Amino acid sequence: MADAAIHGHEHHKPGFFTRWFMSTNHKDIGILYLFVGGFVGLISVLFTVYMRLELMEPGVQYMCQEGARFIASADACTPNGHLWNVMITYHGVLMMFFVVIPALFGGFGNYFMPLQIGAPDMAFPRMNNLSFWLYVAGTSLGVASMLAPGGGGDLGTGAGVGWVLYPPLTTTAEGGYAMDLAIFAVHLSGASSILGAINMITTFLNMRTPGMTLHKVPLFGWSIFVTAWMILLALPVLAGAITMLLTDRNFGTTFFSPSGGGDPILYQHILWFF
């Protein structure tokens, strides 16, 4: 024992990859949500700026079949309606499913709720990591959808169907696989949100510090708790709707087609319930 070495037990700082790609820490994951959400938000804002640039003057100056322009030109411009529809679609889909919900719920909720209720971390830290990377995978599919062949033929790529994804436009008019990728992107974002909601609810109910009754929880914690329940109950309904869109497109079902006994208005009921 005279030769025994004393080993230090001080904290070892993780490397960059370990911390930011494999983290289960609620603060790190909250920061990652905000970072990715901010990046996607920048893309979405650029879309709406481009649309407003086009609307600024009468006629069509920028969205041309000859090629998208960013500076007004005297050259001939044949209007490209498909590009306009793509801008509207992805601005809405990205903002709703990949910016607002992930940043405000996933980002701020992850970072602040455990701090406010005195919890050391989220109830399921490893599931928290899974939730984040499902969100990143969904974001990647959304970006891939913008670059995939759409229903505009030679007019360009992407699904120009509007952010609400109404049939029959989504089931019959958009022949390219950009629409399918967009549906899968929303699926993955929804799965991420459902896992996150389960995590938030469990953390709120089971991990409050001793003495913190429900009446003593800050209102921000309550807002995350209530939002988590709404996500948990409503998102599976939307998942069912877009799954029916997917099968109508690819497997010959007629959930939304009157020709096969389907109801074209059913999707709208389901979407606006969500």
Task: Locate predicted features.
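Membrane-embedded and interfacial regions of multi-pass energy-transducing membrane proteins
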Residues: 2-274
